[in-house]
A protein has these predicted regions:
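Short, low-complexity, intrinsically disordered N-terminal segments
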Residues: 18-20, 109-117
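A boundary/linker detector
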Residues: 1-35, 124-143
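The −1 position to Zn-ligating cysteines in a subset of zinc-ribbon hairpins
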Residues: 20-21, 67, 88
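Short Fe-S-cluster ligation motifs
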Residues: 50-68, 73-74, 114-142
């Protein structure tokens, strides 16, 4: 099976399902497009780099922006579907990469209960700070 691009709709669905927390380390994650807006509002503060490059972003943002990870990598027989996707901070995504559970990748933690949890990865700010609507804002506004 070939790894397919994960649509923005599916990414946002996974982030919301997992309550904007990394399923490996349980840390809250940031919605990376908001970091681009922060950088445009206050240039030179290293809030954002197009490739999330280490040393070019504030470590907190570089390590903890939200990404979707395959629990079982496609190259190891995993599928491209919601059951095989979890929210991962960029740090964990890089650390576990193409590993399987047998090779040291942990099983994803249980989804943190959303009860009394108001964290949204700063995604709600995205629609408020954006100059004009885009695909992400449409997804956020319609969810």
């Amino acid at each position: 099976m070939k790894r397919e691009p994960i649509s923005k709709e599916i990414q946002y669905q996974v982030f919301c399902r997992d309550n904007w927390h990394c399923r490996y380390c349980n840390d809250p994650v940031f919605f990376s497009p908001i970091l681009k807006i922060f950088e445009s509002i206050s240039p030179g503060h290293e809030y954002y780099h197009p490739n999330g490059k280490s040393g070019k972003m504030i470590p907190l943002f570089a390590n903890k922006f939200a990404s979707v990870d395959h629990i079982t990598p496609v190259t190891k027989g995993g599928e491209n579907n919601l059951d095989n996707y979890v929210t991962s901070c960029w740090e964990c995504n890089l650390k576990y990469g193409n590993k399987t559970h047998e090779a040291g990748k942990p099983q994803p933690n249980t989804i943190i209960s959303s009860m009394n949890l108001k964290w949204d990865g700063l995604s709600s700010l995205y629609t408020k700070l954006l100059d004009k609507n885009d695909k992400w804002s449409d997804i956020i506004n319609n969810s």
